[in-house]
Regions:
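A short Gly-Trp-Pro
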Residues: 2-115
Length: 115
């Protein structure tokens, strides 16, 4: 979709509280909407109160990180390790055990319920 292209390929950001995946609470896996690379397990998802799907840990080797200095801020951008699609940002204000908050754009992901 145009919204997926904007986020995944142009590093856009969806408006908070607009993704159905923010309210997804079933067991399953969140994958890249661009290539279906498995990114996050639902067991690491938590409600961060930000309006974006948030996780405290990605699956092994699923994502990469780069420095993002856009908009006068220095942040760590998160991208799909397979296709390079922009997913969101990671912050150090998350819960235990990692203390990290992977703040993801829901439009950049798909969800597959556990069978």
């Amino acid at each position: 979709t145009p919204a997926q292209f904007d986020v995944l390929r142009r590093e856009g950001t969806e408006r908070p509280y607009t993704s159905p995946l923010n309210d997804e609470h079933r067991n399953g896996t969140f994958s890249c909407a661009g290539c279906e690379q498995r990114l996050f397990s639902s067991s690491t998802k938590f409600d961060s109160g930000t309006g974006w799907p948030s996780f405290w840990q990605p699956l092994a080797a699923a994502v990469g990180e780069t420095r993002d200095s856009s908009f006068g801020m220095v942040r760590t951008a998160v991208h799909c390790a397979n296709c390079g699609g922009h997913l969101g940002h990671v912050f150090d204000d998350g819960p235990r055990p990692t203390g990290l908050r992977y703040c993801m754009n829901g439009v950049a992901m798909s969800f597959t319920p556990q069978a």
